[in-house]
Amino acid sequence: MSPSAGVAPPIAAFFATIGFAALAIFGFGFTSLLTDTDVLAEPALGQGAGITAMLVAALVFAATGYGAIRRGRYVGALWVAAATLAAYLVGIAAGGILTGADPAVAVGAVGDFAVSWYLLVLAVTAAVAAWAGIALGRTRASRPQWPWERADDEE
């Protein structure tokens, strides 16, 4: 039996992306509860801007996270977080414009988000999820085995 090569980078990136999206949505909800504010406070944007922003951010997280996981350096988590933040901000503007909002209102919402607690929440969740994905990709652990599943030469 050959030693385990660890988790494949595409699988680690997939799990990290799902974890990022879940943590970000939870973080936004909890921050909204604590601060009694909306994530996107501009009513003219509707829900489309937030949905678009999260989808764009998750796609960029997956793409940059995959690259960081393949390289295996933990500093890559910072670059993934920076790219994810930029993608979320672009997603707010694009989603707002696609839903029919005035472009000035959409850009204003980007500015409001950029100076809110939600930006910090998004940065931390992206960095933590990217770090976890990199750690998962670097590990050489294998699944647990019963004694009778092991090869005879290992005993």
Spans of features found by a protein language model:
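Core hydrophobic alpha-helical transmembrane segments of single-pass membrane proteins
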Residues: 21-22, 85-86, 124-128
